[in-house]
Amino acid sequence: MDISISWVVIIVSVLSYLILMDKWRAAKLPKNIPPGPPKLPLIGHLHLLRGGLPQHLLRGITQKYGPVAHVQLGELFSVVLSSTEAARQAMKVLDPNFADRFVNIGSRIMWYDSEDIIFSRYNDHWRQIRKICVSELLSPKNVRSFGYIRQDEMARLIRLFESSEGKPVNVSEEISKTVCTIVSRVAFGSAVKDQSLLMNLVKESLRMASGFELADVFPSSWLLNLLCFNKYRLWRMRARLDKFLDGFLAEHRVKKSGEFGGEDIIDVLYRMQEDSETKVPITNNGIKGFIYDVFSAGTDTSGATILWALSELMRYPEKMAKAQAEVRETLKGKTNVDMAEVHELKYLRSVVKEALRLHPPFPMIPRLCVQESEVTGYTIPANTRILINVWSIGRDPLYWEDPDTFNPDRYDEVPRDIIGNDFELIPFGSGRRICPGLHFGLANIEVPLAQLLYHFDWKLPPGMTAADIDMTEKTGLSGPRKNPLILVPIIHNPTS
Protein backbone atom coordinates (compact mmCIF):
# COMPACT_ATOMS: atom_id res chain seq x y z
CA MET A 1 0.00 0.00 0.00
CA ASP A 2 2.78 2.41 0.94
CA ILE A 3 4.56 1.61 -2.33
CA SER A 4 1.40 2.37 -4.34
CA ILE A 5 0.95 5.68 -2.55
CA SER A 6 4.60 6.56 -3.19
CA TRP A 7 4.20 5.93 -6.91
CA VAL A 8 1.06 8.06 -7.01
CA VAL A 9 2.91 10.88 -5.26
CA ILE A 10 5.82 10.63 -7.69
CA ILE A 11 3.58 10.60 -10.76
CA VAL A 12 1.47 13.52 -9.51
CA SER A 13 4.61 15.49 -8.65
CA VAL A 14 6.15 14.89 -12.07
CA LEU A 15 2.95 15.83 -13.89
CA SER A 16 2.55 18.95 -11.76
CA TYR A 17 6.11 19.97 -12.53
CA LEU A 18 5.61 19.43 -16.25
CA ILE A 19 2.37 21.41 -16.27
CA LEU A 20 4.05 24.30 -14.44
CA MET A 21 6.96 24.22 -16.90
CA ASP A 22 4.45 24.22 -19.76
CA LYS A 23 2.74 27.32 -18.37
CA TRP A 24 6.10 29.00 -17.73
CA ARG A 25 7.21 28.45 -21.32
CA ALA A 26 3.88 29.75 -22.63
CA ALA A 27 4.18 32.89 -20.49
CA LYS A 28 7.58 33.67 -22.02
CA LEU A 29 6.22 33.74 -25.58
CA PRO A 30 5.60 37.13 -27.25
CA LYS A 31 1.97 38.23 -27.43
CA ASN A 32 1.84 38.50 -31.23
CA ILE A 33 2.64 34.90 -32.08
CA PRO A 34 0.84 33.20 -34.99
CA PRO A 35 -2.59 31.73 -34.20
CA GLY A 36 -3.06 28.03 -33.58
CA PRO A 37 -5.58 25.45 -32.39
CA PRO A 38 -6.52 25.00 -28.73
CA LYS A 39 -3.89 22.83 -27.11
CA LEU A 40 -3.80 20.24 -24.39
CA PRO A 41 -1.54 20.48 -21.34
CA LEU A 42 1.90 18.93 -21.80
CA ILE A 43 1.41 17.49 -25.29
CA GLY A 44 0.19 20.68 -26.97
CA HIS A 45 -1.04 19.75 -30.44
CA LEU A 46 0.51 16.31 -30.77
CA HIS A 47 -2.95 14.73 -30.74
CA LEU A 48 -3.78 16.61 -33.96
CA LEU A 49 -0.91 14.99 -35.85
CA ARG A 50 -2.08 11.39 -35.65
CA GLY A 51 -3.45 9.21 -38.42
CA GLY A 52 -2.00 10.79 -41.54
CA LEU A 53 0.99 12.31 -43.28
CA PRO A 54 2.34 15.40 -41.46
CA GLN A 55 2.09 17.67 -44.52
CA HIS A 56 -1.59 16.75 -44.94
CA LEU A 57 -2.47 17.23 -41.28
CA LEU A 58 -0.60 20.53 -40.99
CA ARG A 59 -2.36 21.76 -44.11
CA GLY A 60 -5.66 21.22 -42.31
CA ILE A 61 -4.45 23.40 -39.44
CA THR A 62 -3.28 26.26 -41.68
CA GLN A 63 -6.50 26.12 -43.71
CA LYS A 64 -8.42 26.78 -40.49
CA TYR A 65 -6.08 29.15 -38.63
CA GLY A 66 -4.27 30.91 -41.46
CA PRO A 67 -1.18 30.29 -43.60
CA VAL A 68 1.14 31.14 -40.70
CA ALA A 69 0.12 29.05 -37.70
CA HIS A 70 1.82 27.77 -34.59
CA VAL A 71 1.79 24.19 -33.35
CA GLN A 72 3.02 23.18 -29.92
CA LEU A 73 4.77 19.83 -30.22
CA GLY A 74 5.36 18.83 -26.62
CA GLU A 75 7.98 21.28 -25.35
CA LEU A 76 8.72 22.63 -28.81
CA PHE A 77 7.11 25.80 -30.13
CA SER A 78 6.90 25.41 -33.90
CA VAL A 79 5.48 27.48 -36.75
CA VAL A 80 4.09 26.21 -40.04
CA LEU A 81 4.41 28.42 -43.13
CA SER A 82 1.95 27.57 -45.92
CA SER A 83 1.81 30.64 -48.16
CA THR A 84 4.08 32.06 -50.83
CA GLU A 85 4.49 35.35 -48.96
CA ALA A 86 5.44 33.65 -45.70
CA ALA A 87 7.89 31.37 -47.53
CA ARG A 88 9.36 34.36 -49.40
CA GLN A 89 9.93 36.30 -46.19
CA ALA A 90 11.55 33.33 -44.43
CA MET A 91 13.69 32.12 -47.34
CA LYS A 92 14.57 35.39 -49.06
CA VAL A 93 13.84 38.60 -47.12
CA LEU A 94 14.93 37.22 -43.73
CA ASP A 95 16.99 34.33 -45.05
CA PRO A 96 19.94 34.68 -42.59
CA ASN A 97 17.53 34.41 -39.64
CA PHE A 98 15.98 31.21 -41.02
CA ALA A 99 18.97 29.52 -42.68
CA ASP A 100 19.72 27.18 -39.79
CA ARG A 101 18.47 23.60 -39.39
CA PHE A 102 17.04 21.84 -36.37
CA VAL A 103 17.86 18.20 -35.83
CA ASN A 104 16.22 15.30 -34.06
CA ILE A 105 17.49 11.99 -32.74
CA GLY A 106 17.26 10.23 -36.09
CA SER A 107 18.96 12.93 -38.15
CA ARG A 108 21.69 13.44 -35.54
CA ILE A 109 22.61 9.75 -35.58
CA MET A 110 22.23 8.88 -39.27
CA TRP A 111 23.63 12.18 -40.62
CA TYR A 112 26.79 11.94 -38.54
CA ASP A 113 26.13 14.60 -35.92
CA SER A 114 25.11 17.06 -38.64
CA GLU A 115 28.56 17.08 -40.25
CA ASP A 116 26.88 16.59 -43.64
CA ILE A 117 25.32 19.28 -45.87
CA ILE A 118 21.59 18.68 -45.39
CA PHE A 119 21.41 18.91 -41.59
CA SER A 120 24.53 20.94 -40.90
CA ARG A 121 24.09 24.10 -38.88
CA TYR A 122 24.41 27.33 -40.82
CA ASN A 123 28.10 27.93 -40.12
CA ASP A 124 31.58 27.90 -41.67
CA HIS A 125 31.56 24.10 -41.93
CA TRP A 126 28.38 24.20 -44.03
CA ARG A 127 29.72 26.99 -46.25
CA GLN A 128 32.96 25.13 -46.85
CA ILE A 129 31.49 21.72 -47.66
CA ARG A 130 28.79 23.23 -49.86
CA LYS A 131 31.36 25.27 -51.79
CA ILE A 132 33.50 22.16 -52.37
CA CYS A 133 30.57 20.09 -53.58
CA VAL A 134 29.22 22.76 -55.92
CA SER A 135 32.59 23.61 -57.46
CA GLU A 136 33.77 20.00 -57.81
CA LEU A 137 30.55 18.16 -58.55
CA LEU A 138 27.28 20.06 -58.78
CA SER A 139 27.92 23.13 -60.95
CA PRO A 140 25.91 23.28 -64.23
CA LYS A 141 29.16 22.85 -66.21
CA ASN A 142 30.10 19.72 -64.27
CA VAL A 143 26.59 18.32 -64.56
CA ARG A 144 26.74 18.68 -68.37
CA SER A 145 30.12 16.93 -68.47
CA PHE A 146 28.59 13.81 -66.90
CA GLY A 147 26.24 13.34 -69.85
CA TYR A 148 27.96 10.22 -71.14
CA ILE A 149 27.31 8.47 -67.82
CA ARG A 150 23.58 9.18 -68.05
CA GLN A 151 23.58 7.96 -71.66
CA ASP A 152 25.49 4.80 -70.74
CA GLU A 153 23.24 3.84 -67.84
CA MET A 154 20.04 4.67 -69.72
CA ALA A 155 21.18 2.46 -72.61
CA ARG A 156 21.48 -0.40 -70.11
CA LEU A 157 18.04 0.29 -68.69
CA ILE A 158 16.48 0.45 -72.15
CA ARG A 159 18.00 -2.92 -73.06
CA LEU A 160 16.62 -4.39 -69.85
CA PHE A 161 13.10 -3.12 -70.56
CA GLU A 162 13.37 -4.30 -74.18
CA SER A 163 14.17 -7.81 -72.94
CA SER A 164 10.98 -7.69 -70.84
CA GLU A 165 8.68 -6.40 -73.59
CA GLY A 166 5.07 -7.29 -73.02
CA LYS A 167 5.65 -8.42 -69.44
CA PRO A 168 4.90 -6.54 -66.20
CA VAL A 169 8.10 -5.10 -64.73
CA ASN A 170 8.87 -3.37 -61.45
CA VAL A 171 9.69 0.05 -62.90
CA SER A 172 10.32 1.48 -59.41
CA GLU A 173 13.09 -0.99 -58.68
CA GLU A 174 14.86 -0.62 -62.03
CA ILE A 175 14.75 3.18 -62.08
CA SER A 176 16.04 3.30 -58.51
CA LYS A 177 18.99 1.09 -59.46
CA THR A 178 19.77 3.16 -62.55
CA VAL A 179 19.70 6.53 -60.78
CA CYS A 180 21.81 5.09 -57.96
CA THR A 181 24.46 3.90 -60.44
CA ILE A 182 24.50 7.27 -62.22
CA VAL A 183 25.01 9.08 -58.91
CA SER A 184 27.71 6.62 -57.82
CA ARG A 185 29.72 6.93 -61.02
CA VAL A 186 29.48 10.72 -61.03
CA ALA A 187 30.31 11.26 -57.35
CA PHE A 188 32.77 8.45 -56.70
CA GLY A 189 34.33 7.63 -60.06
CA SER A 190 32.75 4.18 -60.32
CA ALA A 191 29.68 2.20 -59.37
CA VAL A 192 29.62 1.17 -55.72
CA LYS A 193 30.17 -2.53 -55.05
CA ASP A 194 27.25 -4.20 -53.26
CA GLN A 195 25.08 -1.32 -54.42
CA SER A 196 21.86 -3.13 -53.52
CA LEU A 197 23.10 -3.54 -49.93
CA LEU A 198 23.87 0.18 -49.66
CA MET A 199 20.48 1.11 -51.14
CA ASN A 200 18.72 -1.13 -48.63
CA LEU A 201 20.73 0.32 -45.74
CA VAL A 202 19.88 3.88 -46.80
CA LYS A 203 16.18 3.16 -47.33
CA GLU A 204 15.81 1.33 -44.03
CA SER A 205 17.75 3.97 -42.10
CA LEU A 206 15.64 6.74 -43.68
CA ARG A 207 12.48 4.94 -42.59
CA MET A 208 13.81 4.60 -39.05
CA ALA A 209 15.12 8.17 -38.84
CA SER A 210 11.78 9.58 -40.05
CA GLY A 211 9.78 8.03 -37.23
CA PHE A 212 8.14 10.01 -34.45
CA GLU A 213 9.90 9.97 -31.09
CA LEU A 214 8.52 11.38 -27.82
CA ALA A 215 12.10 12.13 -26.77
CA ASP A 216 12.38 14.57 -29.70
CA VAL A 217 9.45 16.70 -28.55
CA PHE A 218 10.39 16.48 -24.86
CA PRO A 219 14.16 17.01 -25.12
CA SER A 220 14.52 17.95 -21.45
CA SER A 221 13.23 14.55 -20.28
CA TRP A 222 16.15 12.26 -19.50
CA LEU A 223 13.70 9.42 -18.87
CA LEU A 224 12.12 9.61 -22.33
CA ASN A 225 15.57 9.85 -23.86
CA LEU A 226 16.63 6.75 -21.93
CA LEU A 227 13.49 4.86 -22.99
CA CYS A 228 13.80 5.84 -26.66
CA PHE A 229 14.40 2.32 -27.94
CA ASN A 230 14.46 3.40 -31.58
CA LYS A 231 17.59 5.39 -30.72
CA TYR A 232 19.42 2.16 -29.97
CA ARG A 233 18.14 0.59 -33.20
CA LEU A 234 19.39 3.65 -35.07
CA TRP A 235 22.84 3.30 -33.52
CA ARG A 236 22.94 -0.34 -34.62
CA MET A 237 21.92 0.74 -38.12
CA ARG A 238 24.59 3.45 -38.01
CA ALA A 239 27.17 0.77 -37.10
CA ARG A 240 26.13 -1.29 -40.14
CA LEU A 241 26.37 1.78 -42.36
CA ASP A 242 29.76 2.68 -40.84
CA LYS A 243 31.09 -0.79 -41.60
CA PHE A 244 29.99 -0.50 -45.22
CA LEU A 245 31.28 3.05 -45.72
CA ASP A 246 34.59 2.38 -43.96
CA GLY A 247 35.20 -0.50 -46.37
CA PHE A 248 34.17 1.60 -49.35
CA LEU A 249 36.46 4.48 -48.34
CA ALA A 250 39.38 2.12 -47.66
CA GLU A 251 39.06 0.71 -51.19
CA HIS A 252 38.69 4.20 -52.60
CA ARG A 253 41.94 5.41 -51.02
CA VAL A 254 44.02 2.63 -52.60
CA LYS A 255 42.55 2.75 -56.10
CA LYS A 256 44.61 4.61 -58.67
CA SER A 257 41.83 6.67 -60.21
CA GLY A 258 38.18 6.58 -61.19
CA GLU A 259 36.77 6.37 -64.69
CA PHE A 260 37.49 10.07 -65.20
CA GLY A 261 41.20 9.42 -64.75
CA GLY A 262 41.52 12.16 -62.14
CA GLU A 263 40.13 13.25 -58.78
CA ASP A 264 36.55 12.61 -57.80
CA ILE A 265 34.76 14.42 -54.98
CA ILE A 266 35.97 11.93 -52.33
CA ASP A 267 39.57 12.48 -53.43
CA VAL A 268 39.04 16.23 -53.11
CA LEU A 269 37.61 15.87 -49.59
CA TYR A 270 40.54 13.68 -48.53
CA ARG A 271 43.02 16.14 -50.02
CA MET A 272 41.42 19.03 -48.15
CA GLN A 273 41.30 16.93 -44.98
CA GLU A 274 45.09 16.68 -45.11
CA ASP A 275 45.59 20.34 -46.08
CA SER A 276 46.64 22.35 -43.02
CA GLU A 277 45.19 25.51 -44.60
CA THR A 278 41.65 24.13 -44.77
CA LYS A 279 39.57 26.61 -42.76
CA VAL A 280 37.35 24.05 -41.00
CA PRO A 281 38.79 20.55 -40.45
CA ILE A 282 37.09 17.84 -42.51
CA THR A 283 36.55 14.71 -40.45
CA ASN A 284 35.96 11.14 -41.56
CA ASN A 285 32.43 11.48 -40.23
CA GLY A 286 31.99 14.55 -42.42
CA ILE A 287 33.01 12.54 -45.49
CA LYS A 288 30.67 9.70 -44.57
CA GLY A 289 27.90 12.21 -43.92
CA PHE A 290 28.41 13.60 -47.42
CA ILE A 291 28.16 10.11 -48.93
CA TYR A 292 24.96 9.50 -46.99
CA ASP A 293 23.57 12.80 -48.33
CA VAL A 294 24.38 11.74 -51.88
CA PHE A 295 22.50 8.47 -51.61
CA SER A 296 19.63 9.57 -49.36
CA ALA A 297 18.86 12.80 -51.21
CA GLY A 298 20.52 12.48 -54.62
CA THR A 299 19.24 9.00 -55.44
CA ASP A 300 15.90 8.71 -53.69
CA THR A 301 14.49 12.06 -54.81
CA SER A 302 15.36 11.85 -58.52
CA GLY A 303 14.06 8.31 -58.85
CA ALA A 304 10.88 9.18 -56.94
CA THR A 305 10.12 12.14 -59.23
CA ILE A 306 10.54 10.04 -62.39
CA LEU A 307 8.11 7.49 -60.94
CA TRP A 308 5.58 10.14 -59.93
CA ALA A 309 5.75 11.67 -63.43
CA LEU A 310 5.21 8.26 -65.06
CA SER A 311 2.37 7.50 -62.64
CA GLU A 312 0.58 10.75 -63.45
CA LEU A 313 1.07 10.29 -67.21
CA MET A 314 -0.41 6.80 -66.98
CA ARG A 315 -3.47 8.31 -65.28
CA TYR A 316 -3.86 10.92 -68.02
CA PRO A 317 -3.37 9.19 -71.42
CA GLU A 318 -3.87 12.43 -73.36
CA LYS A 319 -0.97 14.03 -71.46
CA MET A 320 1.16 10.94 -72.09
CA ALA A 321 0.39 11.11 -75.82
CA LYS A 322 1.31 14.80 -75.98
CA ALA A 323 4.59 14.27 -74.10
CA GLN A 324 5.57 11.28 -76.26
CA ALA A 325 4.73 13.12 -79.48
CA GLU A 326 7.01 16.01 -78.50
CA VAL A 327 9.84 13.72 -77.40
CA ARG A 328 9.67 11.54 -80.51
CA GLU A 329 9.48 14.44 -82.91
CA THR A 330 12.29 16.44 -81.28
CA LEU A 331 14.69 13.55 -80.63
CA LYS A 332 14.08 11.69 -83.89
CA GLY A 333 17.39 10.56 -85.40
CA LYS A 334 19.49 11.71 -82.43
CA THR A 335 21.74 9.03 -80.96
CA ASN A 336 23.09 10.92 -77.95
CA VAL A 337 20.42 12.49 -75.77
CA ASP A 338 21.28 14.65 -72.78
CA MET A 339 20.63 18.07 -71.26
CA ALA A 340 21.01 20.13 -74.45
CA GLU A 341 18.46 18.00 -76.29
CA VAL A 342 16.08 17.82 -73.32
CA HIS A 343 16.19 21.61 -73.00
CA GLU A 344 14.21 21.74 -76.28
CA LEU A 345 11.41 19.63 -74.78
CA LYS A 346 9.16 22.33 -73.37
CA TYR A 347 6.21 20.07 -72.60
CA LEU A 348 8.32 17.35 -70.99
CA ARG A 349 9.87 19.93 -68.69
CA SER A 350 6.36 21.09 -67.79
CA VAL A 351 5.51 17.46 -66.97
CA VAL A 352 8.45 17.40 -64.56
CA LYS A 353 7.41 20.72 -63.00
CA GLU A 354 3.89 19.42 -62.48
CA ALA A 355 5.15 16.20 -60.92
CA LEU A 356 7.35 18.24 -58.56
CA ARG A 357 4.42 20.51 -57.68
CA LEU A 358 2.12 17.64 -56.74
CA HIS A 359 4.83 15.39 -55.30
CA PRO A 360 7.74 17.52 -54.02
CA PRO A 361 10.86 15.50 -53.07
CA PHE A 362 10.77 17.08 -49.61
CA PRO A 363 7.13 17.86 -48.74
CA MET A 364 8.20 20.01 -45.80
CA ILE A 365 11.40 22.02 -45.49
CA PRO A 366 12.70 22.29 -41.90
CA ARG A 367 14.36 25.49 -40.73
CA LEU A 368 15.30 27.03 -37.40
CA CYS A 369 14.65 30.68 -36.59
CA VAL A 370 17.80 31.80 -34.76
CA GLN A 371 16.70 35.39 -34.09
CA GLU A 372 13.32 36.86 -33.22
CA SER A 373 11.73 37.86 -36.52
CA GLU A 374 8.47 39.09 -37.97
CA VAL A 375 6.76 37.11 -40.74
CA THR A 376 3.54 38.45 -42.30
CA GLY A 377 2.98 40.56 -39.18
CA TYR A 378 3.48 37.78 -36.63
CA THR A 379 6.37 37.52 -34.18
CA ILE A 380 8.47 34.38 -34.50
CA PRO A 381 10.53 33.86 -31.31
CA ALA A 382 14.19 32.86 -31.48
CA ASN A 383 14.81 29.10 -31.55
CA THR A 384 11.42 28.40 -33.11
CA ARG A 385 11.26 25.35 -35.34
CA ILE A 386 9.95 26.27 -38.78
CA LEU A 387 8.14 23.88 -41.13
CA ILE A 388 7.65 25.25 -44.65
CA ASN A 389 4.84 23.15 -46.12
CA VAL A 390 5.95 22.95 -49.75
CA TRP A 391 3.34 20.27 -50.47
CA SER A 392 0.52 22.54 -49.25
CA ILE A 393 1.74 25.60 -51.17
CA GLY A 394 1.86 23.52 -54.36
CA ARG A 395 -1.81 22.57 -53.94
CA ASP A 396 -3.19 25.92 -52.79
CA PRO A 397 -6.17 27.10 -54.91
CA LEU A 398 -5.05 30.70 -54.33
CA TYR A 399 -2.12 30.06 -56.66
CA TRP A 400 -3.23 27.11 -58.79
CA GLU A 401 -6.40 26.44 -60.77
CA ASP A 402 -7.69 22.90 -60.09
CA PRO A 403 -4.69 22.37 -57.80
CA ASP A 404 -5.13 18.61 -57.33
CA THR A 405 -5.27 17.93 -61.08
CA PHE A 406 -2.15 16.94 -63.03
CA ASN A 407 -2.03 19.51 -65.83
CA PRO A 408 1.36 20.36 -67.41
CA ASP A 409 -0.40 22.72 -69.83
CA ARG A 410 -0.92 25.22 -67.01
CA TYR A 411 2.68 26.46 -67.46
CA ASP A 412 1.93 27.69 -70.98
CA GLU A 413 -0.13 30.51 -69.48
CA VAL A 414 1.79 31.12 -66.25
CA PRO A 415 5.41 29.96 -66.57
CA ARG A 416 7.08 29.36 -63.23
CA ASP A 417 10.64 28.28 -62.55
CA ILE A 418 11.67 25.66 -60.00
CA ILE A 419 14.98 27.18 -58.97
CA GLY A 420 13.71 29.15 -56.00
CA ASN A 421 12.50 32.38 -57.61
CA ASP A 422 8.77 31.63 -57.80
CA PHE A 423 7.55 30.74 -54.34
CA GLU A 424 4.44 29.01 -55.63
CA LEU A 425 6.77 26.21 -56.74
CA ILE A 426 9.79 25.55 -54.51
CA PRO A 427 10.43 21.77 -54.60
CA PHE A 428 14.16 22.37 -54.08
CA GLY A 429 13.76 25.18 -51.56
CA SER A 430 15.11 28.70 -51.97
CA GLY A 431 17.68 31.08 -50.55
CA ARG A 432 20.98 30.09 -48.99
CA ARG A 433 19.79 26.55 -48.21
CA ILE A 434 18.41 25.79 -51.65
CA CYS A 435 19.31 22.25 -52.67
CA PRO A 436 22.90 22.39 -54.01
CA GLY A 437 22.17 19.40 -56.25
CA LEU A 438 19.28 21.10 -58.06
CA HIS A 439 20.80 21.00 -61.57
CA PHE A 440 22.22 17.52 -61.04
CA GLY A 441 18.85 16.26 -59.82
CA LEU A 442 16.93 17.80 -62.72
CA ALA A 443 19.31 16.24 -65.24
CA ASN A 444 18.79 12.85 -63.58
CA ILE A 445 15.02 13.30 -63.86
CA GLU A 446 14.51 14.88 -67.28
CA VAL A 447 16.99 12.84 -69.33
CA PRO A 448 15.83 9.39 -68.13
CA LEU A 449 12.16 10.36 -68.43
CA ALA A 450 12.65 11.57 -72.01
CA GLN A 451 14.37 8.31 -72.95
CA LEU A 452 11.64 6.17 -71.37
CA LEU A 453 8.92 8.06 -73.24
CA TYR A 454 10.84 7.93 -76.52
CA HIS A 455 11.60 4.21 -76.61
CA PHE A 456 8.47 2.67 -75.08
CA ASP A 457 4.70 2.76 -75.13
CA TRP A 458 3.77 2.01 -71.54
CA LYS A 459 0.77 -0.12 -70.65
CA LEU A 460 -0.87 -1.13 -67.39
CA PRO A 461 -0.83 -4.79 -66.29
CA PRO A 462 -3.80 -6.89 -67.49
CA GLY A 463 -7.05 -6.13 -65.71
CA MET A 464 -5.86 -2.78 -64.39
CA THR A 465 -7.22 0.66 -65.35
CA ALA A 466 -5.89 4.17 -64.83
CA ALA A 467 -8.24 4.57 -61.86
CA ASP A 468 -6.54 1.60 -60.17
CA ILE A 469 -3.08 3.21 -60.05
CA ASP A 470 -2.05 3.55 -56.42
CA MET A 471 -0.93 7.13 -55.73
CA THR A 472 -0.34 6.70 -51.99
CA GLU A 473 2.69 8.51 -50.58
CA LYS A 474 5.09 6.92 -48.14
CA THR A 475 5.64 8.48 -44.73
CA GLY A 476 9.12 9.93 -44.33
CA LEU A 477 11.49 12.82 -44.94
CA SER A 478 10.93 12.54 -48.69
CA GLY A 479 7.66 11.72 -50.44
CA PRO A 480 8.14 8.64 -52.64
CA ARG A 481 5.41 6.24 -53.75
CA LYS A 482 4.36 3.84 -51.02
CA ASN A 483 4.04 0.89 -53.40
CA PRO A 484 6.09 0.02 -56.50
CA LEU A 485 4.96 1.08 -59.96
CA ILE A 486 4.38 -1.97 -62.16
CA LEU A 487 4.08 -1.31 -65.91
CA VAL A 488 4.33 -3.22 -69.18
CA PRO A 489 6.90 -1.84 -71.69
CA ILE A 490 6.06 -2.05 -75.40
CA ILE A 491 8.92 -1.15 -77.75
CA HIS A 492 8.02 1.86 -79.86
CA ASN A 493 8.36 1.26 -83.59
CA PRO A 494 8.69 4.63 -85.37
CA THR A 495 7.56 3.14 -88.69
CA SER A 496 4.36 1.58 -87.34
Curated annotation (Swiss-Prot):
This protein's pathway: Secondary metabolite biosynthesis; terpenoid biosynthesis
TM segment ranges: 1-21
Membrane topology (UniProt): Single-pass type II membrane protein
Pfam families on file: p450 (PF00067)
Enzyme class: oxidoreductase
UniProt GO molecular function: heme binding; iron ion binding; monooxygenase activity; oxidoreductase activity, acting on paired donors, with incorporation or reduction of molecular oxygen
A cellular component annotation (GO) from this entry: membrane
Keyword Phosphoprotein attached: no
Compartments (UniProt record): Membrane
Matching CDD domains: CYP71-like
Broad class of the protein's primary localization: membrane
Lineage: superkingdom: Eukaryota
Cofactor needs: heme
InterPro entries, sorted: CYP450_71D (IPR052306), Cyt_P450 (IPR001128), Cyt_P450_CS (IPR017972), Cyt_P450_E_grp-I (IPR002401), Cyt_P450_sf (IPR036396)
Uses, biotech or industry: The monoterpenic phenol thymol is widely used as a fragrance and a flavoring ingredient in food and cosmetic industries. Its derivatives have also several biological and pharmacological properties such as antimicrobial, antioxidant, anticarcinogenesis, anti-inflammatory and antispasmodic activities. Medical applications include the treatment of disorders affecting the respiratory, nervous, and cardiovascular systems. It may also act as a growth enhancer and immunomodulator.
Assigned EC number: 1.14.14.-
BP GO terms, sorted: terpenoid biosynthetic process
Keywords: Heme, Iron, Membrane, Metal-binding, Monooxygenase, Oxidoreductase, Signal-anchor, Transmembrane, Transmembrane helix
Record: residues binding heme: C435
Similarity section: Belongs to the cytochrome P450 family.
Matches recorded under PANTHER family: OS06G0641600 PROTEIN, OS08G0105600 PROTEIN
Role summary: Involved in the biosynthesis of phenolic monoterpene natural product thymol which has a broad range of biological activities acting as antimicrobial compound, insecticide, antioxidant and pharmaceutical agent. Catalyzes probably the C3-hydroxylation of gamma-terpinene to produce thymol.
Name of the protein in its database record: Cytochrome P450 71D182
Species name: Thymus vulgaris
